[in-house]
């Protein structure tokens, strides 16, 4: 590889690769290193408006250095966004000068709408993780000693404003709330299954369902009508795949189910990880039709990777929905064949207990064996429960609602005279009139309203609940997905590095000490550097497949909120990926 010109502040738009006849060609190892670096940068900058050519040129120029490439491309995107923001700011400056703080909160802001852009990236190591909204990259400055707030802009919490949520919760004897994540290979029928369940339970009326049937048929996708209840965007419907976690709720006689329909395509694995990170149980959907099961499970499909991820993220019980068995004439032999293969894999390879793996044959499109039994030929040999009955038999884990509050944010948007966030209470409890603290922005906020598990009449929520909070005294651009809200007195820590225990999967090539990887923790996706401490309790410079290692992981993009796995499992478990492949799962052991 030829040496590049030593030019400061080089603009890669003006840079062209030398193509002189005598230039040295890349070796196979260098080509693999180049491809790996490009893939890592692309995944890290997911959502930033940067072309594939810009990424490749930058990686080439920086000799495959991922960190330098990411920083350069972020700087370039930030410059473009900064120019646009300055123009917007200047045009409104005079109007905003004499407005009160309350009027400012209601003013139209160029950052009002949330987007699916990248989160938690920054330009250099002394900056707070960057985030993107409406295509604009914003930066937040930070220091290492800012876990505690320096000042409060609203009054100190008055205990008389609050009630004892744990006591109220225990006395209310509520119906259990269960969080399910539905996973499986693309086109296995996950969204169709959930849509059909919602229709059967009366969550959508016949008139609305008929409208969806007509729309799907007119688009040449008649069999997708139930899936369209969850796949609501134009792109998802056009492509016929779920691209982000679709959330929905339904209720049986025994439980309330909060459902996350995880993407099945490997391009959207980060959405699957986000959906599974807070789930109590999982439903793994497999397509039993001829060749499709083999393609999704045996031929490097996503079913296997999803199973590994589910167990790594702490899910210990799983229901396997053997879908489309009607296409196999409700064959008992086909069901048993799939059951034997999948159960052997889940128990022997992934680590599920035999008693925690359940199999249910279904047809999502016809609704057979989802809610109730019918006259299908299935019941000539199948005597087990319906899918909903199997789910109702699962015992939800106890919720840590008396611990300090830890509330993970999924989405943020502006609402009239306030800011609205959606997320999940991972530990503790939250209520109206409470003061919350966001360690990432060093800002506090006042809870005006709480919607608990889609119930607008609620005034509080506890660990395990999905919530929508209406917040006052904070701006929409001061919060972002991946942030963790806590009590002002017991804030979550924000760190630059941590010690973790990881378990590698079957990987192509060892993980070397000093490697740059992509860390997934809930909605947070960011680049990290990994240094090996020990491998199987021995010193080593690399980690091979199926090894347990103690490592030190450092964030490359500033400080991040983090919890020990023993204190809050949902916020202390993570996944490591490299070049588009999942390479390891880990738990946080020590904050540095």
From Swiss-Prot:
Residues 1-35, 78-159 are annotated as: Disordered. It comes from the Eukaryota. Residues 240-244 are annotated as: G2. GO terms for biological process: cytoplasmic translational termination; endoplasmic reticulum unfolded protein response; nuclear-transcribed mRNA catabolic process, no-go decay; regulation of translation; translation. Residues 175-401 form the tr-type G domain. Residues 82-111, 137-151 have a biased composition (Basic and acidic residues). GO terms for molecular function: GTP binding; GTPase activity; translation elongation factor activity; translation release factor activity. Residues 12-32 have a biased composition (Acidic residues). SUPFAM superfamilies: EF-Tu/eEF-1alpha/eIF2-gamma C-terminal domain, P-loop containing nucleoside triphosphate hydrolases, Translation proteins. Keywords: Cytoplasm, Elongation factor, GTP-binding, Hydrolase, Nucleotide-binding, Protein biosynthesis, Translation regulation. Residues 261-264 are annotated as: G3. It is an enzyme of class 3 (hydrolase). It catalyses: GTP + H2O = GDP + phosphate + H(+). This is Elongation factor 1 alpha-like protein. It comes from Schizosaccharomyces pombe (strain 972 / ATCC 24843).
């Amino acid at each position: 590889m030829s040496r590049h010109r030593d030019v400061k502040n080089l603009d890669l738009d003006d840079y062209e690769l030398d193509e002189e006849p005598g230039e040295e060609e890349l070796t196979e190892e260098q080509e693999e290193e180049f491809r790996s670096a490009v893939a890592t940068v692309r995944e890290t900058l997911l959502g930033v408006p940067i072309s594939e050519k810009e990424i490749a040129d930058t990686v080439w120029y920086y000799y495959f250095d991922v960190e330098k490439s990411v920083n350069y491309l972020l700087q370039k995107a930030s410059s473009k966004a900064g120019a646009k923001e300055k123009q917007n700011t200047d045009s409104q400056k005079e109007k905003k000068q004499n407005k009160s703080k309350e009027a400012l909160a209601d003013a139209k802001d160029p950052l009002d709408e949330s987007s699916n852009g990248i989160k938690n990236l920054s330009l250099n190591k002394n900056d707070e993780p960057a985030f993107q909204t409406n295509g604009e990259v914003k930066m937040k400055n930070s220091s290492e000693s800012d876990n505690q707030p320096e000042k409060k802009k609203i009054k100190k919490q008055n205990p008389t404003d609050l009630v004892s949520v744990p006591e109220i919760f225990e006395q209310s004897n509520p119906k259990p709330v269960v969080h399910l994540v539905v996973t499986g290979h693309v086109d296995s029928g996950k969204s169709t299954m959930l849509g059909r369940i919602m229709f059967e339970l009366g969550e959508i009326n016949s008139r609305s369902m008929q409208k969806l049937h007509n729309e799907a048929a007119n688009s040449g996708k008649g069999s997708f009508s139930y899936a369209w209840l969850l796949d609501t965007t134009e792109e998802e419907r056009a492509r016929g795949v779920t691209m982000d976690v679709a959330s929905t709720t339904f209720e049986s006689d025994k439980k309330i189910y909060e459902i996350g329909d995880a993407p099945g395509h490997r391009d959207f694995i980060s959405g699957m990880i986000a959906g599974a990170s807070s789930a109590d149980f999982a439903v793994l959907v497999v397509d039993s039709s001829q060749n499709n099961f083999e393609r999704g499970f045996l031929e490097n499909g996503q079913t296997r990777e999803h199973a590994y991820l589910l167990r790594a993220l702490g899910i210990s019980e799983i229901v396997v929905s053997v879908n489309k068995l009607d296409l196999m004439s409700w064959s008992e032999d086909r069901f048993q064949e799939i059951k034997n293969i999948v159960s052997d894999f889940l128990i022997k390879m992934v680590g599920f207990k035999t008693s925690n793996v359940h199999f249910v044959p279904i047809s999502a499109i016809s609704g057979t064996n989802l809610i109730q039994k019918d006259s299908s030929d299935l019941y000539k040999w199948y005597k087990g429960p319906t899918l909903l009955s199997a789910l109702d038999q699962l015992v939800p884990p106890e919720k840590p609602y008396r611990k300090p509050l830890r509330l993970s944010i999924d989405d943020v948007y502006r609402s009239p005279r306030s800011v609205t966030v959606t997320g999940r209470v991972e530990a503790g409890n939250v209520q109206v009139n409470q003061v919350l603290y966001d360690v990432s922005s060093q800002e506090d906020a006042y809870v005006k309203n709480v919607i608990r598990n889609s119930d607008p009449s609620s005034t509080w929520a506890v660990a395990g609940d999905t919530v929508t909070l209406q917040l006052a005294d904070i701006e929409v651009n001061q919060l972002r997905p991946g942030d963790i809200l806590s009590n002002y007195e017991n804030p979550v820590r924000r760190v630059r590095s941590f010690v973790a225990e990881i378990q590698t999967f079957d990987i192509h090539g060892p993980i070397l000490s000093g490697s740059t990887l992509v860390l997934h923790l809930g909605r947070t996706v960011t680049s990290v550097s990994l240094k090996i401490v020990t491998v199987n309790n021995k010193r080593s410079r690399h980690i091979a497949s199926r090894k347990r290692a103690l490592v030190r992981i450092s964030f490359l993009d500033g400080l991040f909120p983090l919890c020990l796995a023993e204190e809050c499992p949902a916020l202390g478990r993570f996944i490591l990926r490299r070049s588009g492949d999942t390479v390891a799962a880990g738990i946080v052991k020590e904050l540095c």
